[in-house]
Amino acid sequence: MLLTLLKGKLHRARVTHADLHYEGSCGIDGDLLDLAGIRENESIDIYNVSNGKRFRTYAIRAEAGSGIISLNGAAAYMADLGDIVIICAYAQMDEQEADTHKPKLVYCNEDNTVKDTANIIPVQVS
């Protein structure tokens, strides 16, 4: 049996660009892509914390160090500039791989620089 687990996440990134007429995709600062282990053309889910919208597109590389998070094509309708988003990539693996899997988590500052990285999500407490 294959399980689908979180592979990489950009947490609380901010949308910096939207281009309705660009080919569909999400342009992501190359440094952030690499840190989160997200590959170019990989399917990603985007969760808009600011408005609750959730959608899927694919990642493309934006200039490293630019802080760019650009929603392109139809995805440009899903967020406003400055919206806070969570960008996730998932991977399928068997149960044995899942037992040792650690996701790559990247926590972003307001300017999309790296605030912190981790490979475990803290236990939620009441």
From Swiss-Prot:
Residues carrying Pyruvic acid (Ser): 25
Pathway(s) where this gene product acts: Cofactor biosynthesis; (R)-pantothenate biosynthesis; beta-alanine from L-aspartate: step 1/1
Co-factor binding comment: Binds 1 pyruvoyl group covalently per subunit.
Pfam families: Asp_decarbox
Cellular component terms (Gene Ontology): cytosol
Entry-linked CDD domains: Asp_decarbox (cd06919)
Cofactor: pyruvate
Catalytic residues of the enzyme: 25, 58
EC number of this enzyme: 4.1.1.11
Alphabetically ordered keywords of this record: Autocatalytic cleavage, Cytoplasm, Decarboxylase, Lyase, Pantothenate biosynthesis, Pyruvate, Schiff base, Zymogen
Subunit structure of this chain's protein: Heterooctamer of four alpha and four beta subunits.
Protein name: Aspartate 1-decarboxylase
Organism: Psychrobacter sp. (strain PRwf-1)
Taxonomy of the source species: Bacteria, Pseudomonadati, Pseudomonadota, Gammaproteobacteria, Moraxellales
